[in-house]
Amino acid sequence: NDYVIYRELRTRPGYLYSKDAVVRTVRELGQLQLFDAQNINPEFKNADPNAGTVDIEYKLTETGSSQVQLQGGYGGGSFIGTLALSFNNFSIRNLFNPKAYRPVPMGDGQALSLSFQISRYYRTYGFSFTEPWMGGKQPVQFSVSFSRTEQFGYSYRSYDVDKSKRVYITGISVGLAKRLRVPDDYFQIAHTLSYQHYDLKNYPNLGLFTFKDGNSNSLAYTISLSRNSSGPNPIYPMSGSSFTISAKLTPPYSLFNKVDYGKLFEERETASNNGDSERIAQIDQERFHWLEFYKL
């Protein structure tokens, strides 16, 4: 739809001519990944020095905004199949409009991806959705994603699958990102709230925990500040720069959950000295029921 283009224009009827505005418009149109960024050429027409007016026409060439990935392979005694769908110009408002399916609703500049991977001993699937202009008036980006991994015990010698041993990992995240005006509008601040749940049953080989039965949870908040002026092609930029600083942290559970972690640490040391792996697993299940960390 045309408004997906119009909202990125820095040159509007009645505006004073600005070379910077033209260059920025070319960059923003290239960042959409809906057009060939190498061939966005502004043409100047009907220049009138007396009236101080000029018409600017942007020549755009659409590129494929959707991708389909289908892969199959064999390894470790198992067939592995992958299906991934990506739509960079999706239209969720037409999701229930049968006439909009050609083959899927398109035109609103939203991004939707779906992925599936399956083999004899694991399967994983997920989706993500991004709305770059939530509400349609301000460049506030909304995103949501979901993923699920199911893995079972597997012998690489006999190629046997043991479904009595399994781990499920479920994750979901919601994010908001806003374009800033100060110091300049290349800056963006983003907030993301994410949750992951680990559910283990007789599964000793995950590598994250010492216990093989139990569950663990991770609720984390991520804040990032970025500046990206690279372009016009987002994949092969020819100018500009990009940097990001971020912090990820969880709630300080140890301050209010009334668990004596010092005592647990001492008990774990004792169990470790005695070679009591079962007690170590019990202690670690309590220690890591809710993960607590920060990362800069």
Predicted regions and their residues:
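Solvent-exposed loop segments that connect transmembrane elements
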Residues: N257-F288
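N-terminal periplasmic "start-of-domain" segments of outer-membrane beta-barrel proteins
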Residues: N1-P13
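Outer/extracellular conduits and scaffolds centered on Gram-negative outer-membrane beta-barrels
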Residues: T250, H289-Y294
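Gram-negative/organellar outer-membrane beta-barrel architecture
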Residues: Y15-T244, E269-E278, F293
